[in-house]
Amino acid sequence: MKILDVNVLLYAVNSASTHHVVVKRWLDAALASDETLGVPWVAALGFLRIATNPRAMTTPLTPQQALAFLDALFAYPNVVQIAPGKEHWALLRDLIAKAQTAGNLTTDAHLAALAIEHGAELCSTDGDFSRFKALRWVNPIAKTA
């Protein structure tokens, strides 16, 4: 399973972004695959908050457009909504303690804990995830050799 961070969703819809083409191509390929893609609630809510915010987006989506994007995403048979399970707090606590971080990286630790708990790979363009050593993650815009 791959778990999607909010930045993947935002780049996929934001045609003004320099990362749009690469991330949209990556996401389209992932959606067409047999692999399960997990969308955490925090990523879905973050997408709605940021994609519709004129201070965050040059051309923000309307609420209806943002909801339609998520509806279309959740309609794929290989896309599931991801929520914390019984081990989440222990994993989150351990990640924050080992990385000696919290503050602005608390949500990153939450996403890392979700991915670890679900045996998944986190997909994000955010390099801060490298501080969580137990996490498997991939950056869709990273150059491949």
Enumerate the language-model features and the residues they cover:
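Short beta-strand segments at enzyme active-site cores
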Residues: 38-41, 125
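Short, well-structured N-terminal submotif of metal-dependent ribonuclease cores
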Residues: 1-3, 7-39, 54-68, 144-145
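Acidic, PIN/NYN-like endoribonuclease modules and their adjacent C-terminal/linker elements
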Residues: 1, 112-145
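Structured helix-beta-strand junction loops
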Residues: 33-34, 76-77, 117-118, 132
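Acidic active-site catalytic centers that drive phospho-/nucleotidyl reactions
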Residues: 5, 108, 126
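Extracytoplasmic
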Residues: 47
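Ligand-binding beta-strand-loop-alpha-helix segment within the catalytic cores
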Residues: 73
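Active-site neighborhoods of divalent-metal-dependent phosphate/nucleic-acid chemistry enzymes
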Residues: 79-123
